[in-house]
């Protein structure tokens, strides 16, 4: 399974739209695709029309050793999804005390490599522990930017210096 994280610490740059488009496009091409909604805004989960009431969500995978990715997978028209959760905004503090705080997502996703061709991770607008979990789990990163002076002269170079 190839895992691609779509991340940028800025909001409004199209991370969710790009994540959904890539996941749905790969699914239409016959690829087994998993979308992981790490954004507490849950836009990908809502667009996939997934009800998360009493369901395992990405928050559970980030903060508990009791669940694996298989426990949270739901099907939608664009493939499969691990739904987001508004509680992801609390995950940073919940994860901070864990020794494995940077590998919780990667650890939870072990065992599904043979089930999918691609996993697409929609990241929140931050570079905190949640996004860093996505980066650790990912084989590739896509950093969408709005092609303006601020993004190209400041945000892209600063992100590259920090994680490059």
Residue ranges with predicted function:
Residues 1-164:
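P-loop NTP-binding core
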